[in-house]
Amino acid sequence: VDEHGRQLGTGRNLAALKAELGGQARSAFQALAALKTGTAPAAPAAAVTPAPGTAPAGSRSAKASPPPPSAAPEPLAPQAYTAWTFGELPELMEIRKAGQTLIGFPALIDRGTQVEIEVFDEPAAAAVKHRAGLRRLLALNLKEPLKYLEKNIPDLQKMAVAFMPLGTQEELRTQIIDVALERAFLAEPLPHDAASFQARIDEGRTRLNLIAQEIARQAGAVLLEFAAAQRKLKDARAPKDVADDIAAQLQRLMGKRFIAATPWAQLQHLPRYLKGVQLRLDKLRGDPARDAQRLAELRPLEQRWSRRVAELKGAPDARLDEYRWLMEELRISFFAQELKTPQPVSTKRLDKVWAQMSM
């Protein structure tokens, strides 16, 4: 509803309403960010408040006279920050416009040399962006320690050679540092104000280098086995079905950002999964029929996973992730039993997990 009582849009989906109402919803959310720094415009288009139950951030609501009937709200330029100078950041916030309520999830956005605050309609999307924004803000406040770290990652040049099929040495270095920042400073619950942010910096600074060295060693172990698996696949002259299956597995495990994209617990298992590929190829010539039988059992399990991933269009799903890593353990059980699995795994176990996901 606008200031004259005309209905502009209904519903609680922020994305749809933002698309329908154009800059009006965006301007109202940006007004909230402006309020944090005392730079709010004189006449915001709506009341803006943190949602009930979220952390307070000082004065979070504003009411102002509406713009003239003929004037549409101008979108506000995002405010740039290089330090935590914007008060508390709530997990979610609301704007109210003539009885219409929109719920949004604020996040820090990485802009390279600065961060900005934006509001998302989906909490999962906000969480991903917010972590990246927090990492950037940390980096901007840890310039000297990071300058030292960039020059002292162990065996970086050697790792970069094995990383060449995936990316550059600089991309490898960036991933190692990003994960080191995550593990040193960004354990849950995440900092929500300047005091907790500074406390994280003080706590994590002393262990940053040790954590980065640990990550680099693990990345090196993964890349060593990746190179060996690639060589063995090239030399094995495996049947097309097997070669295609292994190539797809390697692509899943070893994306360009495998260090940053793989959870730390699973990153420690990647060398074993890659060694399992090598053992599978070693055994293939001796018993191709057994390999074909196991592959036939795997295919329907992986096909349903692939379909669900496509349906989610990038949205995170913890249970689907669990299923994905169980498939890797099943491959070890099928093709490289001597490497062992940390827990019993079978097709029945995966079917049970899938059934629980579908409930």
Regions found by a protein language model. Give the residues of each.
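A positional "C-terminalness" feature that preferentially activates on distal terminal regions of long
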Residues: V1-M359
